[in-house]
Amino acid sequence: MKERTIQPVNNGLNGNITIPGDKSISHRAVMFGAIAEGTTTIKGFLPGADCLSTISCFKEMGVDIVQNGDEVTVVGKGLEGLQEPKAVLDVGNSGTTIRLMSGILANTPFLSCVQGDTSIAKRPMKRVTNPLKQMGANIDGREEGTFTPLTIRGGDLKAIEYTSPVASAQVKSAILLAGLRAEGVTAVTEPHISRDHTERMLEAFGVKVTREGKTVKLAGGQKLTATDVQVPGDVSSAAFFLVAGAIIPNSKLVLENVGMNPTRTGIIDVLEKMGATFTVEPINEGASEPAANITIETSSLKGIEIGGDIIPRLIDEIPVIALAATQAEGITVIKDAHELKVKETNRIDTVVAELTKLGARIEATDDRMIIYGKSALKGNTVNSYGDHRIGMMLAIAGCIAEGKTIIEDAEAVGVSYPTFFEELQKLAK
């Protein structure tokens, strides 16, 4: 378990930074390329541990995939061409891999066994396995399919009209992917609109998808046709440097090629509402996945209330938003965030515990956090608990803390941002 020591940044963070490829889009590009007909070339791929797990799993099912840094070539097998894996499909720490892949495996004629690390073993799978079972897939696992390892034997699926109790792109995507080979029209309705990378990419691969408010539909029997994919930078990774630029004195950062999918830009809306000073320059208007260059500088922030429809648009950014709130004048309330409890860690409890160690005034209830600003943070020993987003949030916190901050289990950041610490060090010079 590796440690990282973070020293206070006295002269600000300054410079340009190219944000690594979007994790959600990278996963989907590999998966959709694997079940498409033809060869897909992916540029801007994120070579982090999670996305490499996706490549590994589909290679195990006979897909020819060549990865060279951030460029990947996938020779598609078509929807019916995947082969029965000879070994257990290991997703590592990736919830996206296991949930979306379950939707694909639900319509394959073979048996597969899927598992991940100890974090995955604690994450709820029934939200995905239940609707897939309703469609006709044979799925089992610990506690009746609630937890991994899962065994999946696909079947002749029938379309369903499913109302999801949670706004989850992973649940929605698993059902839609199963629906590609189901008889009839599959529909998923959510309480709030979740990120729509699956819908956008399916359309790019030639699948007709219908969107009606909070409902997404597709007809079974459609094939995917290979296409080239350009992956923009991950706004969830950019969030750490957006907050850093706003709260570290004497900072000015230019973040290049940041994905600006409107279902993901809640962090931008929140920073604007808090009073951050930044500009957004679109760079590829009209693209399937829009992107922009963002310039941000040290700002005076104020506390706000965050909740409702915006939560699915910033669910992964809440840990670093909580950090920003510790440096804002007044009280910030983050509510309706119960989904944080079933991430890589219980992120409500973890954020509160670790920021409290650094001197923040922060409280938790069942689905919310209340943060009292403005807090003077002091260095301490903290822990990511294997959660990449907690690790990066704590690193930014260490930059404004008095004295050194030691982060235990710091290597977790490699899941989504392998070069994070190197970039941070470069910008601090």
UniProtKB/Swiss-Prot annotation:
GO cellular component labels: cytoplasm
Q: Name one GO molecular function term.
A: 3-phosphoshikimate 1-carboxyvinyltransferase activity
Catalytic residue positions:
D316 (proton acceptor)
**Which SUPFAM superfamilies does UniProt cross-reference here?**
EPT/RTPC-like
Name the top EC class: transferase
Question: What is a biological process (GO) this protein takes part in?
Answer: amino acid biosynthetic process
Residue stretches in coiled coil: none
Q: What are the protein's UniProt keywords?
A: Amino-acid biosynthesis, Aromatic amino acid biosynthesis, Cytoplasm, Transferase
Enzyme Commission number(s) from the entry: 2.5.1.19
Q: Where the protein is mainly located, per its record?
A: cytoplasm
Annotated positions binding phosphoenolpyruvate? K23, G95, R123, Q170, R347, R389
Lineage, top-rank taxon, reads: Bacteria
Which pathway does the protein contribute to?
A: Metabolic intermediate biosynthesis; chorismate biosynthesis; chorismate from D-erythrose 4-phosphate and phosphoenolpyruvate: step 6/7
List the catalytic activities from the record.
3-phosphoshikimate + phosphoenolpyruvate = 5-O-(1-carboxyvinyl)-3-phosphoshikimate + phosphate
Kindly list the positions annotated as binding 3-phosphoshikimate. K23, S24, R28, S168, Q170, D316, K343
Compartments (UniProt record)? Cytoplasm
Under Pfam families, the record lists: EPSP_synthase
What exactly does this protein do? Catalyzes the transfer of the enolpyruvyl moiety of phosphoenolpyruvate (PEP) to the 5-hydroxyl of shikimate-3-phosphate (S3P) to produce enolpyruvyl shikimate-3-phosphate and inorganic phosphate.
UniProt record similarity statement: Belongs to the EPSP synthase family.
Which NCBIfam families does the protein's record reference?
aroA
HAMAP family xrefs:
EPSP_synth
Q: How does it assemble?
A: Monomer.
Name assigned to this protein: 3-phosphoshikimate 1-carboxyvinyltransferase
Classification of source organism: Bacteria, Bacillati, Bacillota, Bacilli, Bacillales
Q: Which gene encodes it?
A: aroA
